[in-house]
Amino acid sequence: MASTRAQVITRRTYNRPLNEEGTEFESWEQTIGRVISHQKWLWERAKGETRLTAEEWNELAELQQLLLDRKAAVAGRTLWLGDTEISRRRESSMFNCSFTIVETVYDVVDVLWLLLQGCGVGF
């Protein structure tokens, strides 16, 4: 069982609202289901097909159980934005931190763009 503090932070940060009023929120199980759905979508897209093998399904099921049991964690960005429309349209919304070598004005533009998306940038 998660501590009260962890539950408050999870509700505030990761559980997505289920209604327009923002009075009902995902449960931890629903949040993890959304994360697994996002991971499945990433896998299908990377493979270029929508059929996963039995081994891949088993890996997703194992990941889901580890996340539900709080024995493993994914990036906070994935908990927050995973399987949302914005994460599919703007992949940079999922960037957490990055590194670049700034040599030109174009590199500065890239850095500013990433910073505006909420991504930390080291250089």
Which stretches of residues belong to each language-model region?
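Extended catalytic cores of very large enzyme megasubunits
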Residues: M1-F123
